[in-house]
Curated annotation (Swiss-Prot):
Residues 8-25 have a biased composition (Low complexity). It comes from Dictyostelium discoideum. Zn(2+) binds at residues 419, 422, 443, 446. GO terms for molecular function: histone deacetylase activity, NAD-dependent; metal ion binding; NAD+ binding. This is NAD-dependent deacetylase sir2D. InterPro entries: DHS-like_NAD/FAD-binding_dom, NAD-dep_sirtuin_deacylases, Sirtuin, Sirtuin_cat_small_dom_sf, Ssirtuin_cat_dom. Residues 165-193 form a coiled coil. The gene is sir2D. It catalyses: N(6)-acetyl-L-lysyl-[protein] + NAD(+) + H2O = 2''-O-acetyl-ADP-D-ribose + nicotinamide + L-lysyl-[protein]. Pfam families: SIR2. The lineage of its organism: Eukaryota, Amoebozoa, Evosea, Eumycetozoa, Dictyostelia. Belongs to the sirtuin family. Keywords: Coiled coil, Metal-binding, NAD, Transferase, Zinc.
Amino acid sequence: MNKRSLENNELNEIQNNQNKNNNNKINKEIPSDNTPLKKLKSINSLEQLQEVDEDEDLDVEIDTKLINKLDKKGRKYEFVGEGYSDEEQISDDYEDDESSEYEYGYENEDELLDDEDHLDNINEIKKIQKKLVNTETSTSITNTSSTTTTSTSTTTTTTTKTQINETILLDILNNNKDEVDDEIQRIGNNVGNSKEEEGEEEEENIELVARSFIYKHIQEKKSLGIDPIEFTKDIGFKLELEKDDDAWEIITAFLTRKKVAVNLFLNYLKYNTLARPYRKKIATLDLSTFEKVCQLFESSKNIVIITGAGVSVSCGIPDFRSKGGVYETIEKKYNLPRPESLFDIHYLRANPLPFFEFAKEIFPGNHKPSPTHSFIKLLDEKGKLLRNYTQNIDTLEHVAGIDREKLVNCHGSFSTATCITCKLTVDGTTIRDTIMKMEIPLCQQCNDGQSFMKPDIVFFGENLPDRFDQCVLKDVKDIDLLIVMGSSLQVQPVSLLPDIVDKQIPQILINRELVAQPHEFDYVYLGDCDQFVQDLLNKVKW
């Protein structure tokens, strides 16, 4: 059975006036534009939140027997999400020494199905919980019983009731950002089995709260006679059913999976609704003609540009997701769970050979920068470029001469390589010959025949460089124009940048196809980046 669930894990909400009445059937009423708003400050977002009633609490009952039942029912469905990597069954995908002990990533039928944590959102909720405890607010978590045995077939039901005052949550995040972020950093730096076990228990509790809350929410909508298809549309999903499918069972199986449930629950805490609000065009901004777009470029002084593989296609470097691109080539050449697995850090550690056989195809060579790269360099020279966030690893921005201070290599580059074991870092040219031979570059310092030098590109499952967060926090204060060029905006957290920027900052998309829907750009140019640049330069005469 094939099920398609569209939109990524940052679930979008349709808020325009024509759909507002429908939305209110599913979620609480969205306030009008003159409703008082609060701003949430965090590492990853600067979002406007709606005011919530001080007396309103969330009551969540957790039943582990129910959770196990959800896991077993959900196991028979395969969900495919565009731009959203759901829970990965590591033991199916990767062959390592431990995988033989597991089936589908868990030891027995009673264990939770999910394998990976969505760390950004987990940390957001951790912040909330920890600050509530430290400030002795009205939040309380009471365990009425907690005995669960997973090593045998016996499972005792655990019931937990959580009461969360939403206004207090927002106030704490708003007023204690630095302190909360420091606390999360301290947690992340802790080393020791006892601390790790404590963290695992905390994450497990968060996931159970989220999944139980979403299950309860679904049951309420079902009991009210809400149409299941309309329910999924209103929270940003498209559900396609086959004959005899039980719609509510499928919805429950998908939305109560760990990552999805945590995202929805986090949205509810932030926005008092399951779906995240999306950006609309600036009503007062007129970009109805190309001439007006050119005028905007001329008047802007702090331009932020997000570039993807589309800006390098004309250089002879294939992009990743289009027809004939990198992922299609990988799919034909290798027997992988999915093409992206070649760039998954877990897969790399378990089986590095496929990546190093393919690395030759994407290793920077003698390619020359495109007209788009040269245009970004021109903006830099004219003092208009605030930052270029590039998702590319081809280093052509460096070749074009863009000031390195104005450049953020979001996904790293081949310029250096680091041993996965001893962390020795060497210049990328050191491993070039080995990669050209399609061999694994072993670490000479470890000299154990197994440790290898990994190019310092960011794999799925790895954190972005610290410089990314540092620059984002600075740039959102100064930016006056955001440009997205040649990017599918499918990989987080870079794909979140258009949402982070103040909604009154103009945004332009230059790409071969429309992306990030239902997010609205103020001007969209569907075509080649180089052609846009040529058309623009013909008008502005720089």
